[in-house]
Amino acid sequence: MPKGIPLTEEEIDRRRHEIFHSSVALILKQGFANTSMQEIAEAAGVGKSTLYDYFPTKDHVLLFVFEEELDILQGQAEDIAAQDIPVEEKLLKILEAQLEYLLNNKNFFTELSMQVMQLGQTGQQRIMKKRYAYQDLLRGVLEQGGREGVFRPVNTRLAARAMIETMEVLVYTTRPTGTPREMLGDVLDMFMHGIKS
């Protein structure tokens, strides 16, 4: 960790966030693979050796960035899940928040997702833990709906995964049938009512 006066965990975390925020534009412009640690250090206004104090490797930068993005999504979903509103509205709001996030961060999320696949096993496991937490939260909403008799009994783990993956399809499809928000309405109608007449 940084030399000299010892920093608290809070100060270290704040500095990591500052480095992250100052390097986002650079990563978006050049791509993560084409951005060097020297360039990240320059964008953050720190020396390369100082950068290594906070992030020992470029993979650590990537992991931190991706975990931060997943934490934002998770935090939004947790806030919605805690609201005292009908479970159908809760589900819709969570999916709308995910869709909005993906639309607002489309290029950045695409770049991060491609690079994360190159991480080692430990990094992959950390990312999967975050993804599973989001899936489990959505699964909890579906199970709440089941207990309340709003949703019929289904494989909630599979349903949650399908809904999450569908949000990405709505953003990245090359054959849209409407705006992403319009397609979300269509997809939710299919999820809620099926396709059988």
PLM segments and residue spans:
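Hydrophobic alpha-helical connector segments
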Residues: 64, 78-104, 159-163, 184
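Amphipathic alpha-helical segments used for helix-helix packing
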Residues: 102-122
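Short hydrophobic/aromatic patch on the recognition helix
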Residues: 45-55
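C-terminal peripheral helix-coil segments that are non-catalytic and often amphipathic
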Residues: 1-3, 100, 136, 140-148, ...
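Amphipathic alpha-helical segments enriched in hydrophobic/aromatic and basic residues
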Residues: 8, 27, 32, 36-37, ...
